[in-house]
Amino acid sequence: MAKTLGLHIIADLYGVNPDLIDREEDIRHLLENSVKAGELTKISSHFYQFNPHGATGVILLAESHISIHTWPEHKTATVDVFTCGDPSKAYRAMDYIINSLSPTHVDKKVFDRGIIEDSKGKDVLWIMSKAGCC
Amino acid sequence: MAKTLGLHIIADLYGVNPDLIDREEDIRHLLENSVKAGELTKISSHFYQFNPHGATGVILLAESHISIHTWPEHKTATVDVFTCGDPSKAYRAMDYIINSLSPTHVDKKVFDRGIIEDSKGKDVLWIMSKAGCC
């Protein structure tokens, strides 16, 4: 039986008010709050202001990552939420971002990432070797 | 006529030698070199070591981002390369990572991100307002 290691939601947001996505501090605030909305665990966050327009940012999570890249001159933002563990957390984080930016149109896709055969289990020999067992 | 703002390659790598993806310093080296292979422009890079196994990391690019999350106990790594501009750079960066990790199987998908109607052009009024023109 297969199981998946992660859930990845990608969303392209169109018709966004450009003033909401132009500044690094605004997308930082947006993504930090999405982490709270999803009850996710932040490791670190990193943002960058482009000149003259747009910003980019990522939050590394214990559960994987959230990223955003913005083109305010096109009223467009691309957002990724990739989490392992409880899938509802990814949906809650993405919903927070979409609701906050109120795009006129969203192109959203959802993928399972890392599909493994549960029957094969873990690489026990390697794990034991790392633990100094063999 | 439509044009796309970015190209996103996602790849799940299976059957990877776990010793190649267990340590933060190894995936840092891998991703930093993929940036060079793709002739991409690094803004900043961020990595984290999980305990007991696996690591996570992202490089913010002027062109968007590269990320990796690893599960050495499952011989699995998930990799994203998302770039705007010349699409060949994304392929070269991803090819570098895949060739370096030599997985037995790869599940790879490619997406256009941010598809805009070129005929609509940019939001000129907003751009002018930001430039203090109106």
From Swiss-Prot, chains A, B:
InterPro entries: AdoMetDC_fam_prok, S-AdoMet_deCO2ase_core, S-AdoMet_deCOase_pro-enz
Site entry: Cleavage (non-hydrolytic): 63-64
GO cellular component: cytosol
EC primary class: lyase
Keywords of this entry: Autocatalytic cleavage, Decarboxylase, Lyase, Polyamine biosynthesis, Pyruvate, S-adenosyl-L-methionine, Schiff base, Spermidine biosynthesis, Zymogen
Pathway: Amine and polyamine biosynthesis; S-adenosylmethioninamine biosynthesis; S-adenosylmethioninamine from S-adenosyl-L-methionine: step 1/1
Pfam families listed in its UniProt record: AdoMet_dc (PF02675)
UniProt PTM comment: Is synthesized initially as an inactive proenzyme. Formation of the active enzyme involves a self-maturation process in which the active site pyruvoyl group is generated from an internal serine residue via an autocatalytic post-translational modification. Two non-identical subunits are generated from the proenzyme in this reaction, and the pyruvate is formed at the N-terminus of the alpha chain, which is derived from the carboxyl end of the proenzyme.
Pyruvic acid (Ser): residues bearing it: 64
Keyword Hydrolase among record annotations: no
Reaction it catalyzes: S-adenosyl-L-methionine + H(+) = S-adenosyl 3-(methylsulfanyl)propylamine + CO2
Keyword S-adenosyl-L-methionine appears in the UniProt entry: yes
Cofactor descriptive note: Binds 1 pyruvoyl group covalently per subunit.
Residues of the active site: 64, 69, 84
GO molecular function, one term: adenosylmethionine decarboxylase activity
Cofactor annotation: pyruvate
EC numbers for this chain: 4.1.1.50
GO annotation terms (biological process): spermidine biosynthetic process
Biological role stated in the UniProt entry: Catalyzes the decarboxylation of S-adenosylmethionine to S-adenosylmethioninamine (dcAdoMet), the propylamine donor required for the synthesis of the polyamines spermine and spermidine from the diamine putrescine.
PANTHER family on file: S-ADENOSYLMETHIONINE DECARBOXYLASE PROENZYME
Subunit and partners: Heterotetramer of two alpha and two beta chains arranged as a dimer of alpha/beta heterodimers.
Entry's family note: Belongs to the prokaryotic AdoMetDC family. Type 1 subfamily.
Name assigned to this protein: S-adenosylmethionine decarboxylase proenzyme
Gene: speH
